[in-house]
Amino acid sequence: MTMRESGMIPLFFHSDAELGKKVLKACYVGGARLLEFTSRGDFAHEVFAELNKYAMAELPGMILGVGSITDAGAASLYMQLGANFIVTPVLREDIALVCNRRKVLWSPGCGSLTEIARAEELGCEIVKLFPGSTYGPGFVKAIKGPCPWTDIMPTGGVSTEESNLRGWFEAGVTCVGLGSKLISKEILVQKDFKKLEEDVRKTLDLIKAVRS
């Protein structure tokens, strides 16, 4: 399943691999087939390796990528561990080079049309609008005017509310990244994975309805 088909990518990090597997399974059962593991803690690569092995063995069709990558070395490390896509908060040409060499999709964080154009020149298929809360749907709509071919994925500033999702998709985004608004601290503390499963399903249904 592609980012366009899915319309949503859950974003998640936790240092506990066993808890991560439960999050992964809940998202999978809820209908998600893409997940971005955000590399934000010590030994995060070890956690990702466990999650990716679990997904390959137990969750057919689940595609894991890695976010919060800020240099080519980290991108190379995660690709060696099986990352299917790389998401970055910044536009860096060194990351573009290592991902393109391995034919792994990369999505750089961009905040201007100049950055977006440069990313596309470097082979980027979908840009990350970050932080989405700073720019908003109006920015996306403005970009899509002169550049209707540009695929945009906002993260930050995206919620599971219908009005929020409608605003983004009507502006022309390809998909959205959802972190704590979907996989909340409360869900993790209470280990309420059934609620997460239901929230993922409901959000995917909302996106489908908004797009139709």
Regions found by a protein language model. Name each.
Residues 1-73, 77-81, 170, 190-211:
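Conserved N-terminal beta1-alpha1 strand-loop-helix module at the mouth
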Residues 28-33, 79-86, 101-107, 121-126, ...:
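Glycine-enriched alpha-helix->loop->beta-strand junction motifs that scaffold or abut catalytic
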